[in-house]
Amino acid sequence: MASISLPKHSLPSLLPTLKPITSSSQNLPILSKSSQSQFYGLKFSHSTSLSIPSSSSVKNTIFAKVNKGQAPPSFTLKDQDGKTLSLSKFKGKPVVVYFYPADETPGCTKQACAFRDSYEKFKKAGAEVVGISGDDPSSHKAFAKKYRLPFTLLSDEGNKIRKEWGVPADLFGTLPGRQTYVLDKKGVVQLIYNNQFQPEKHIDETLKLLQSL
């Protein structure tokens, strides 16, 4: 029987050496862009990089800390006029608290204008509407003026309240979440609605719930 002999550099030695993935590889960059762009309602500018978070960070963003039937953590934040406002101010009436990614982005503008167009329905239901994002008060003021928003916008710079409420991020943790809460007169959460890509549906769902309270 004929035999085949391999040269000294056998097949395994011809294959590239693969380095094992270490803990330092948990966050792998998947997007880098030097110029400004927008993606699903979020602004990216000047060397913005997105990364896939580690399994532990994903777990923390998926499981919310505030659940239906609970009273959420209170807050005191500045509104678009620079005045401080606390959640306790709304005790005794229903309140819609919606977290959104950023002012002046396509999805967030649609959502804000949809709340504006239905604002009288919310007032008729006896409810207040409050929007929260990480933008500063001056950004909120310009945003509210441009689109004639009749409700309060609060500045959560550093996203402290977003984290305390456990608002989940989207797209592997790279996008701030778009989540709406409806609190009843006692300050207890009766609805949590999350929909990043259909911002107008937040209005339909919250009105439906308010009409049943």
UniProtKB/Swiss-Prot annotation:
Subunit structure: Monomer.
Subcellular location field: Plastid, Chloroplast thylakoid lumen
Disulfide bonds: 108-113
Keywords, alphabetical: Antioxidant, Chloroplast, Disulfide bond, Oxidoreductase, Peroxidase, Plastid, Redox-active center, Thylakoid, Transit peptide
Catalytic site positions: 108 (cysteine sulfenic acid (-soh) intermediate)
Swiss-Prot/TrEMBL induction comment: By pathogen attack.
BP GO terms, sorted: cell redox homeostasis; cellular response to oxidative stress
Domain named Thioredoxin: residues: 66-213
Family: Belongs to the peroxiredoxin family. BCP/PrxQ subfamily.
EC number: 1.11.1.24
SUPFAM superfamilies for this protein: Thioredoxin-like (SSF52833)
Top-rank taxon: Eukaryota
Gene Ontology CC: chloroplast thylakoid lumen; chloroplast thylakoid membrane
Miscellaneous note of the record: The active site is a conserved redox-active cysteine residue, the peroxidatic cysteine (C(P)), which makes the nucleophilic attack on the peroxide substrate. The peroxide oxidizes the C(P)-SH to cysteine sulfenic acid (C(P)-SOH), which then reacts with another cysteine residue, the resolving cysteine (C(R)), to form a disulfide bridge. The disulfide is subsequently reduced by an appropriate electron donor to complete the catalytic cycle. In this atypical 2-Cys peroxiredoxin, C(R) is present in the same subunit to form an intramolecular disulfide.
Molecular-function annotations in GO: thioredoxin peroxidase activity
InterPro entries attached to this UniProt entry: AhpC/TSA (IPR000866), Peroxiredoxin_BCP/PrxQ (IPR050924), Thioredoxin-like_sf (IPR036249), Thioredoxin_domain (IPR013766)
Record: transit peptide: 1-54
Protein known as: Peroxiredoxin Q, chloroplastic
Catalytic activity: a hydroperoxide + [thioredoxin]-dithiol = an alcohol + [thioredoxin]-disulfide + H2O
One Pfam family of this chain: AhpC-TSA
Record has Thylakoid as a keyword: yes
Function of the protein: Thiol-specific peroxidase that catalyzes the reduction of hydrogen peroxide and organic hydroperoxides to water and alcohols, respectively. Plays a role in cell protection against oxidative stress by detoxifying peroxides. Involved in the plant defense against pathogen.
